[in-house]
Amino acid sequence: RQKSKAKLLHLIQAEKLIFNVPNLISFSAINFEQVSSEIIYKISNEFTSRKIAIRSSAADEDGCYKSSAGEYTSVLNVFSDNKKEIIAAINTVILSYKKKRSVRPEDEIIVQEMLQDTIMSGVIFTHDLNTGAPYYVINYDDQSGLTDTVTSGESEYANRTLYVHRNSVNKLHSERFIKLLTAVQELEKTMNSQFLDIEFALDADLNPYLLQVRTITTQPNWNRAVVKRIDATLQGVQSFITERFKKLKGVYGKNTILGQMPDWNPVEMIGRAPRAL
């Protein structure tokens, strides 16, 4: 059985990985009304004059073979000194549990510090979600400065995607993606899994932050032969290009240049109705 979102974040935070986990506390949702004063006091002491996120961590939210991601509510940008606002946000999350079924003892609430100066955020799948192809698929927003645009799908900047073959991370030139995927690879080793769904953010100093991690639940639908087919195709492409770049006897020049229609058809240049320039 996979651990809850809250328990996983606590465990990863304790590992002191490249991925930073924003400061958090968690508590059971089922007895909040009985101990609300104690919890509010703890939140106020832990997060003084800061913006916090009140996040769901339901018992059935992140399973190994089934996910209820997005079915429960989280409330962002709650001011930690505002008792009424905190209570209202917690009750909103608990209500989202009750709308689906009765609250369970395993249901938790996460209270977590909001990140500041975010320059990029998004979701990484460590294999293609639909096919299992061996690529890191990074859906990201590097424009808005928010942390939830990709997961909510509500931003015009939420559709940027980068594919990086799992064996080609060392070929990257972008410092931010190098740092991000280095952190992802360490997390894979720590969790002993190459099939992860990761929510992340980067700050202005390119420090990677882990907001959530769960198992990819679409694995049973994958064709296990896809990895071999892709690798064979890539090898074929590499061989084809290598052959084309060989120096040709009797042809001037040392380098080959591949182009699309480098010699234009004059008819296409002047168009169907040519006229004097």
Residue spans of the language-model regions?
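N-terminal beta-alpha lobe that positions the nucleotide/phosphoryl donor
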Residues: 1-110, 117-119, 196
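Conserved divalent-metal-coordinating catalytic cores
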Residues: 1-18, 84-90, 105, 122-277
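Active-site beta-strand->loop segment that positions catalytic residues and contacts the acyl thioester
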Residues: 115-116, 187
